[in-house]
Amino acid sequence: MYQPDFPPVPFRLGLYPVVDSVVWIERLLQAGVKTLQLRIKDKCDEDVEPDVANAIKLGRRYGARLFINDYWQLAIQHQAYGVHLGQEDLETTDLSAIRNAGLRLGVSTHDDMEIDVALAARPSYIALGHVFPTQTKQMPSAPQGLEQLTRHIERLADYPTVAIGGISLERVPAVLKTGVGSVAVVSAITQAADWQVATAQLLQLAGAGDE
C-alpha cells in the first residue's frame, strides 16, 4: 500500500526530464513540462545555490513539480517541490529534515535490494533504472531491460514509479506498456536535433502527469 513517509506525488508524473541548467528548466517549463529535475553534479553548495534558487522560483511560477537532485539542504532552504536522492545519499542525508520541511522525496534504485532500501525510507516515488544502456553517466550495474522493469513495476504496483536510463523517443511506448507511471529522459531532449519537437512528441506519448 502506498503510504509514504513524505508528501505524496501523483501516481503518474508523466514526462520527467532531468537537466543540468536553469536554461533548460525554463525552456521545458515554457514547453509545458510539469515534472522535471535539476541535476547539477560535483559543485559545492555555494556555487550551485543561485541555480537551485532560480530553478525553484521558475518551477513555482509555472506550477510545476521541480525536484532538486542531491542538494537537499538548498532544496529545503528555497522550498523546492521535492528532492531526488541516489542510494549512496540516503545514509548521509537528514531524511527527517526533508520530511519536516514538507518536501517530496524520490529515490533511485537499480535492483531488488536497492528497492528494499528505498521502500524502507517510504519515499514519495521510486525511480527504476537504468532501463537501457546510457551515455549520460557512468553506471555500476548492467541495464535492466523491459522484462526486469516490468517485474519491478508489478512488485510496486501501487507506488508511483519512474523509469530512467537510455530512454529514447522510440522506446517510450514500450516503456509505458510496463505500467510505469513516469518516463525520465535526458539526452532524448537535450541532444535532440530539435528539442522543442522532441519535447512535444514526448509529452504526447508520456503526458504531463496527473494533477
From Swiss-Prot:
Pathway: Cofactor biosynthesis; thiamine diphosphate biosynthesis; thiamine phosphate from 4-amino-2-methyl-5-diphosphomethylpyrimidine and 4-methyl-5-(2-phosphoethyl)-thiazole: step 1/1
Positions bound to 2-[(2R,5Z)-2-carboxy-4-methylthiazol-5(2H)-ylidene]ethyl phosphate: 134-136, 166, 186-187
UniProt cross-references to InterPro entries, sorted A to Z: Aldolase_TIM, ThiamineP_synth_sf, ThiamineP_synth_TenI, TMP_synthase
Molecular function GO terms recorded: magnesium ion binding; thiamine-phosphate diphosphorylase activity
CDD domains: TMP_TenI (cd00564)
Cofactor list: Mg(2+)
Pfam families assigned: TMP-TENI
Keywords from the named record: Magnesium, Metal-binding, Thiamine biosynthesis, Transferase
First-level EC class: transferase
Cofactor binding mode and count: Binds 1 Mg(2+) ion per subunit.
Signal peptide: none
Catalytic activity: 2-[(2R,5Z)-2-carboxy-4-methylthiazol-5(2H)-ylidene]ethyl phosphate + 4-amino-2-methyl-5-(diphosphooxymethyl)pyrimidine + 2 H(+) = thiamine phosphate + CO2 + diphosphate; 2-(2-carboxy-4-methylthiazol-5-yl)ethyl phosphate + 4-amino-2-methyl-5-(diphosphooxymethyl)pyrimidine + 2 H(+) = thiamine phosphate + CO2 + diphosphate; 4-methyl-5-(2-phosphooxyethyl)-thiazole + 4-amino-2-methyl-5-(diphosphooxymethyl)pyrimidine + H(+) = thiamine phosphate + diphosphate
Cellular compartments per GO CC: cytoplasm
Binding site for Mg(2+): 70, 89
Xref: Gene3D superfamilies: Aldolase class I
E.C. number: 2.5.1.3
Binding site for 4-amino-2-methyl-5-(diphosphooxymethyl)pyrimidine: 37-41, 69, 108, 137
Top-level taxonomic group: Bacteria
GO BP annotation list: thiamine biosynthetic process; thiamine diphosphate biosynthetic process
Record has Magnesium as a keyword: yes
NCBIfam families: PRK03512.1 (NF002904), thiE (TIGR00693)
Family listed: Belongs to the thiamine-phosphate synthase family.
PANTHER family cross-referenced by the UniProt entry: THIAMINE-PHOSPHATE PYROPHOSPHORYLASE, THIAMINE-PHOSPHATE SYNTHASE
Reported function: Condenses 4-methyl-5-(beta-hydroxyethyl)thiazole monophosphate (THZ-P) and 2-methyl-4-amino-5-hydroxymethyl pyrimidine pyrophosphate (HMP-PP) to form thiamine monophosphate (TMP).
Protein's UniProt name: Thiamine-phosphate synthase
